[in-house]
Amino acid sequence: MRARRALIAVCVIAAASLLSACGEHTMHNGDANNDGTFINAGNVVYQLQVSRELNQYSPEDKSYFIGLPKSAANLTASQLWFGVFLWAKNQTKDSRRTTDNFDIVDTLGRKYYPLKLNSAINPYAWTSTPLMPGATQPNPNTTAGVGPTGGELLLFKLNTSIYNNRPLTLQIRAPSGNKVWATISLDL
């Protein structure tokens, strides 16, 4: 009789622990050592294509700065340009919108926000986009989709002190509010 009660107690505890995880939201994290990791965020799958320092005077990088507001175009001696190129896919059966709410956080907790690029003239600029089931951002038939990065650009102006405060973390947030859907560790 004691063995039977013990078995029932073990089964009840096991069932309770399994059920306690139901409904929990798990934040997904990506690692900078593996560009290309798929991250689920808000019913859309995001993938870091490339993240790197950019040079506005380099012929290779010059087109990434098209559509940058003149008020944000200059760097101080203690700033640098940093680009995060993302790809996204809707793997659901319903239309979904990608987010445009991102930030980078360093190990001291300082936040950096992407600069708004004019997507009407910059074919690499990331913008929130509705995706039909199976659709991707960027569209594979666009400049960003066939370009060297395979992703659309989030352009950041960072302090050079970030080299001392690595790794950096890209936070993918809900379109409105501060809820963090997922994070990706970035390195320089």
Predicted regions and their residues:
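Sec-dependent bacterial lipoprotein signal peptides
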Residues: 1-20
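Conserved functional micro-motifs across diverse proteins
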Residues: 22-188
